[in-house]
């Protein structure tokens, strides 16, 4: 026999609240459907629902609550449904790449440039290209900000962001003394270094910054690649070699030793080939 059971109506509100007590403060049970959502009327806890919804990126729930408020639903007149500052949640949603919630918040009038565009900087840092593209299309960025975005993307190895910036003429590969290539080398992002050099970045820019700092930071793959591309080994002077040792990168020291570079044949301004 096929018996249909309505789980929601067959259990009293008190039982559902007891079940909720085992859920460590998570509210997802109430977001299952409209019937369960109405159980929030029975909830007796000190929590702001909108804080929870925004922090989780639940755009559909946020829009549903908006519709209830517009219809003056009694449930949404409870203190737990009071509005909260969406600016701080905007920052977190940009960090986590939640585009639908970001669009929702923009439509709600969020301050896109809050804290010196920290939201967009986080989208770059975490490689959220869709979010960055959307925010960029809103037209709030200056040339100086594009420079900082290029640095952040290169620092964190976000090749997708770099491709976007270059393709859309926001920055050039050689801009700011080959900032993209230098930064990528410094932080060990080999593919981005290759991309930059393939697109005519100057390997010796800024006093051979790329080779010196990739060496001091222990990025052996980057070092070997730069050397293979003709990096000026005179940049590896005695001071640089000592810094490499201080940082504990014995593999770099060993590599340089195999190609004839060591403190024995170096001075403060460059090495002498044996």
Swiss-Prot record:
Check the record and name the InterPro entries matching this protein: Ankyrin_rpt (IPR002110), Ankyrin_rpt-contain_sf (IPR036770)
UniProt entry keywords in alphabetical sequence: ANK repeat, Repeat
Annotated ANK repeat ranges: 85-114, 145-175, 176-205, 206-235
Tell me the Gene3D superfamilies matching this sequence.
Answer: Ankyrin repeat-containing domain
Which superkingdom is the protein from?
Answer: Viruses
Record flagged with keyword Repeat: yes
Which PROSITE patterns does the annotation name? Answer: ANK_REP_REGION, ANK_REPEAT
Q: Coiled coil located at which positions? A: none
> Known Pfam families for this protein?
Ank_2
Q: Please give the name of this protein.
A: Putative ankyrin repeat protein L589
Organism whose genome encodes this protein? Acanthamoeba polyphaga mimivirus (APMV)
From the broadest rank down, the organism's phylogenetic lineage runs: Viruses, Varidnaviria, Bamfordvirae, Nucleocytoviricota, Megaviricetes
């Amino acid at each position: 026999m096929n018996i249909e059971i309505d789980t929601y109506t067959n259990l009293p509100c008190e039982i559902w609240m007891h079940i909720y007590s085992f859920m460590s403060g998570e509210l997802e049970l109430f977001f299952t459907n409209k019937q369960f959502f109405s159980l929030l009327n029975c909830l007796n806890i000190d929590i702001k629902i909108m804080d929870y919804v925004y922090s989780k990126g639940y755009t559909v729930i946020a829009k549903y609550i908006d519709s209830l408020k517009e219809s003056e639903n009694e449930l949404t007149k409870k203190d737990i449904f009071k509005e909260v500052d969406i600016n701080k949640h905007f920052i977190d949603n940009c960090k986590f790449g939640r585009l639908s919630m970001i669009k929702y918040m923009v439509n709600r009038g969020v301050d896109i440039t809050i804290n010196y565009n920290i939201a967009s900087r986080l989208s770059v840092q975490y490689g959220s290209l869709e979010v960055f593209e959307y925010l960029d299309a809103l037209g709030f960025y200056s040339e100086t900000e594009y420079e900082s975005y290029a640095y952040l993307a290169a620092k964190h190895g976000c090749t997708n962001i770099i491709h976007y910036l270059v393709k859309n003429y926001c920055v050039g590969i050689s801009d700011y003394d080959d900032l993209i290539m230098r930064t990528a080398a410094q932080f060990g992002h080999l593919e981005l270094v290759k991309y930059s050099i393939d697109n005519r970045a100057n390997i010796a820019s800024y006093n051979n910054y790329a080779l010196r700092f990739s060496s001091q930071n222990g990025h052996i793959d980057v070092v070997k690649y730069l050397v293979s591309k003709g990096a000026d080994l005179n940049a590896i002077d005695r001071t640089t070699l000592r810094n490499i040792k201080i940082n504990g990168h014995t593999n770099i020291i060993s590599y340089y030793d195999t190609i004839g570079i060591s403190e024995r044949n170096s001075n403060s301004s460059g090495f002498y080939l044996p």
